[in-house]
């Protein structure tokens, strides 16, 4: 109505991921000082709001060496990183359903952070794509070795860090929900 102001709390609202950028700083501060110089952060990505928050923290001066856009088979952004062409498509249903996005609303924000320079985006953001079989395997593997249950989105993030962590590099992967939700 004309008397109400309506907003959204999902990742299209900058009011959500500005505060989200704070936990990137918090994570960095939790690391021992000797592990803060060479950090890789793997972010489960569907609508790319969380990755946008991390990149904003990086732009504000947080010394993150590399980000990984960890995606399920809905690989619109990984394909852009690989080819430089952004092509939306129908989403595919997966176990990591919050990442089932064929036209991520925050993609434009990411490219704008880099002045629409594909090579600059590609230099700071790597990608990893995981299918449901790989996601299930990661959940099982982490549980059997660590006794920790990953949610499907976190499993995709875990696989992204595994694919890109270099020797001597501190790696962090994010989760998005409690596994009981799934």
Q: Would you name each region that the model predicts?
A:
Residues 1-182:
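PLP-dependent amino-acid enzyme catalytic core
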């Amino acid at each position: 109505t004309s008397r109400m102001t309506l907003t959204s709390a999902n990742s299209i609202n900058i009011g959500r991921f500005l505060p989200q950028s704070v936990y990137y700083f918090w994570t960095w501060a939790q690391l021992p000082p000797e592990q803060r110089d060479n950090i890789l952060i793997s972010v489960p990505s569907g609508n790319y709001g969380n990755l946008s928050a991390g990149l904003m923290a990086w732009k504000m001066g947080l010394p993150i060496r590399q980000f990984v856009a960890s995606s399920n088979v809905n690989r619109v952004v990984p394909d852009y990183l690989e080819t430089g062409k952004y092509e939306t498509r129908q989403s595919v249903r997966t176990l990591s359903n919050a990442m089932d996005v064929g036209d991520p609303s925050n993609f434009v924000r990411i490219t704008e952070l880099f002045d629409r320079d594909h090579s600059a985006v590609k230099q700071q953001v790597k990608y990893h794509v995981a299918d449901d079989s790989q996601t299930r395997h990661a959940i099982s593997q982490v549980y059997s070795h660590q006794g920790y249950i990953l949610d499907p989105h976190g499993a995709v993030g875990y696989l992204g860090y595994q694919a890109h962590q270099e020797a001597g590099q501190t790696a962090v992967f994010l989760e998005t929900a409690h596994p009981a939700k799934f």
